[in-house]
Amino acid sequence: MKVPAIIFSRMGSSRLPGKALRHIAGEPLIKRVINRVSKVKNLSTIVVATSNSKADDRLVRYIQSLNIDVFRGAAHDVLNRAVSCASYLGVEKFVRINGDSPFIDPELLEKGIELGGDPNLDLISNVFPRTYPVGTSVEIIK
């Protein structure tokens, strides 16, 4: 089963504005996340879902320079952005990734995607209860 990965990222963080493009070990945070996610074998595509706010224009240009698709939606309604992006992609199921998770584990994502092949499951997650470190969340949503 192949599913898309939707990476949620925007520049308007209240705790650390602009963090998506802040450099971590010499490259922007969002690039580190994209690089980790791109190692996952059973993805159909990678899309970065950001807001339609002008504040995210710079982020959009950067992501497009990496040849990664971008979806723009509601700034403060992540659920709406997720549903709209899935609809835009024409999918019922997707991998949800936080854009500030540079330590996401590709192998863990692959295991989650394999479990997500069960049509009776609407959510696969390793955060209920949290047993993995923050920043390594896996969520496959239907």
Language-model regions: role of each:
Residues 104-142:
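Conserved core of the sugar-phosphate nucleotidyltransferase
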Residues 52-117:
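Short phosphate-binding loop-to-helix
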Residues 8, 97-98, 127:
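Short beta-strand segments
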